[in-house]
């Protein structure tokens, strides 16, 4: 029987940070936990970052993942929102590396392509595919589903058939190696 790997996926946000924990055995994915870390909207940024760091630390301590994956920041129309999101993401990364976890990063496009099959998928499509892929009886909250989708993306890219077919990690794009 294949060894099990536990992966923590994080969808960072300054107000709500979603997380998802899955186990991967061979080509099978199993739901462990998911949830949302909510920060007080009226709290100063430093306090909100402290909440994110503390709660991600608790998730790591309780569920003991061996690997972590975080969604990268996308550039928003509002520069202030992008900066806030970047700071929340930095808090998540700091919490993970302080627990000595290897961290991989994926763009929203990569997550949607891995889970749904197309990069322009709607949040509802991501939620639906997370439910299907993990055999869940209910639909997780959108941010928690995104955290699970990030974990699934990491599993599919590093533990699934794609990793076995391309162990070097090299990607071919339009006939060129990158």
Swiss-Prot record:
Main localization of the protein described in the UniProt heading: cytoplasm
Annotated residues for binding of Mg(2+) 1: 11, 143
UniProt keyword DNA-binding present: yes
Reactions accelerated catalytically: Endonucleolytic cleavage at a junction such as a reciprocal single-stranded crossover between two homologous DNA duplexes (Holliday junction)
GO biological process per UniProt: DNA recombination; DNA repair
Cell location: Cytoplasm
Catalytic center residues: 11, 71, 143
Enzyme class: hydrolase
Cofactor: Mg(2+)
Residues binding Mg(2+) 2, per UniProt: 71
Cofactor binding notes: Binds 2 Mg(2+) ion per subunit.
GO cellular component annotations of the record: cytoplasm; Holliday junction resolvase complex
Summary of subunit composition and partner proteins: Homodimer which binds Holliday junction (HJ) DNA. The HJ becomes 2-fold symmetrical on binding to RuvC with unstacked arms; it has a different conformation from HJ DNA in complex with RuvA. In the full resolvosome a probable DNA-RuvA(4)-RuvB(12)-RuvC(2) complex forms which resolves the HJ.
Chain's role: The RuvA-RuvB-RuvC complex processes Holliday junction (HJ) DNA during genetic recombination and DNA repair. Endonuclease that resolves HJ intermediates. Cleaves cruciform DNA by making single-stranded nicks across the HJ at symmetrical positions within the homologous arms, yielding a 5'-phosphate and a 3'-hydroxyl group; requires a central core of homology in the junction. The consensus cleavage sequence is 5'-(A/T)TT(C/G)-3'. Cleavage occurs on the 3'-side of the TT dinucleotide at the point of strand exchange.
Descriptive protein name: Crossover junction endodeoxyribonuclease RuvC
């Amino acid at each position: 029987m294949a060894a099990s790997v536990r992966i923590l996926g994080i969808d960072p946000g300054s107000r709500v940070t979603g997380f998802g924990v899955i186990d991967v055995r061979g080509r099978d994915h199993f739901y462990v936990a998911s949830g949302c870390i909510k920060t007080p909207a009226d709290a100063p940024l430093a306090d909100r970052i402290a909440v994110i760091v503390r709660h991600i630390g608790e998730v790591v301590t309780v569920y003991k993942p061996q690997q972590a994956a975080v969604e990268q920041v996308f550039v928003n129309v509002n520069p202030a929102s992008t900066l806030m999101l970047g700071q929340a993401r930095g808090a998540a990364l700091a919490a993970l590396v302080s627990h000595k976890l290897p961290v991989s990063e994926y763009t929203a496009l990569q997550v949607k392509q891995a889970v749904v099959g197309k990069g322009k998928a709607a949040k509802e499509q991501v939620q639906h595919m997370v439910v299907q892929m993990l055999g869940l009886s209910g639909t997780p909250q959108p941010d928690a589903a995104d955290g699970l989708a990030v974990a699934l993306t990491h599993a599919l890219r590093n533990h699934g058939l794609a990793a076995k077919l391309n162990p070097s990690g090299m990607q071919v794009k339009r006939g060129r190696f990158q």
